[in-house]
Design a protein with these regions (language model features):
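Active-site neighborhood of phospho(di)ester-bond hydrolases with catalytic His/Asp-centered motifs
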Residues: 5-7, 29-34, 60-66, 93-94, ...
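Active-site-proximal segments of metal-dependent phosphoesterases and phosphodiesterases across multiple
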Residues: 36, 44, 114-115, 137-186
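Core dinuclear metal-dependent hydrolase active-site scaffold
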Residues: 1-18, 94-135, 216-229
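Binuclear metal-dependent phosphoesterase catalytic core
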Residues: 97-101, 172-185, 189, 196-231
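Core catalytic region of metal-dependent phosphoesterases/phosphodiesterases
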Residues: 6, 11-100, 167-169
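Short glycine-/acidic-enriched loop or helix-start segments at secondary-structure transitions
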Residues: 15-16, 40-41, 72-74, 104, ...
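Short, conserved loop/helix-junction motifs that constitute active-site signature segments
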Residues: 21-24, 52-57, 84-87, 134-136, ...
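Short, electropositive alpha-helical surface patch
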Residues: 81-86, 159-160, 167-169, 204-216
Length: 231
């Protein structure tokens, strides 16, 4: 089974690069959030869905990210739009599971507080509780935020990260995944985005393959590598 992972396209309906971007054919396409740019209007969502549904995969799974405000603010309307693409293999996960040909997926968009964007959870205990809902039998976990210390560096200094080398992932997610590893029920793959600087990279730690699937680099150009695996 060939599975391709991407994230953080920040798809702009006026950007020709995305209209021309076609991914290599495979079985399953996983998208780890930030499908929108401003994230406020339905036009961006519809544009993404039209692009996503045309990709050459039988099954196309996506979650939201912090830029995807419309999906958080108008969930009923968003789900109505998404449902129209169900027959084209599009699946949206929001703290929910999905099984395809024996492979169990779970997706969560939630992440630590970041400037009050979408799906932010300021309360650490609530965020921990959210991640604790990840089923133990999950094969492939899709999150928007990386776990702390794993492919989560921006490599670009800014006011909140003076060296550009600080870890920016979620400590809560890392703790939950560590607990699962101790019980030998860790996911086989954890795919995420959010931090563009480590996009297009993968790292095997123990029995788990971690993938930062961000397609955009830190200048929001879609230059990071596309990652595919045989599962």
């Amino acid at each position: 089974m060939k599975i391709t992972f991407i994230s953080d396209t920040h798809t702009n309906m006026y950007d020709k690069r995305y209209k021309e971007l076609m991914l290599p054919e495979g079985d399953i396409l996983c998208f780890s959030g930030d499908l929108m740019t401003s994230g406020h209007n339905e036009g961006e969502l519809i544009h993404f869905l039209k692009w996503f549904s045309k990709q050459p995969f039988k099954c196309k799974i996506f979650i939201a990210g912090n830029h995807d405000r419309y999906l958080e603010n108008y969930p009923l309307l968003a789900n109505d739009f998404i449902s129209k693409f169900k027959n084209e293999g599009v699946v949206y996960l929001n703290n929910s599971s999905f099984e395809y040909k024996g492979i169990k997926f779970y997706g969560t968009p939630h992440q630590p507080y970041f400037c009050g964007w979408a799906f932010n959870v300021p309360d650490c205990e609530k965020l921990m509780h959210t991640y604790q809902q990840i089923p133990d039998d999950t094969d492939i976990l899709l999150t928007h935020c990386p776990p702390f210390g794993i492919l989560d560096k921006s490599h670009q200094p800014n006011y909140s990260n003076p060296t550009g080398e600080e870890c920016l992932g979620s400590k809560e997610l890392k703790k939950v995944l560590d607990e699962k590893t101790e019980r030998n029920c860790q996911p086989k793959v954890v795919a995420f985005g959010h931090i563009h600087g480590d996009g297009g990279k993968k790292e095997k730690i123990g029995k788990t393959l971690y993938i930062n699937a961000s397609l955009c680099d830190e200048y929001y150009d879609p230059t990071n590598s596309i990652i595919s695996i045989d599962f």
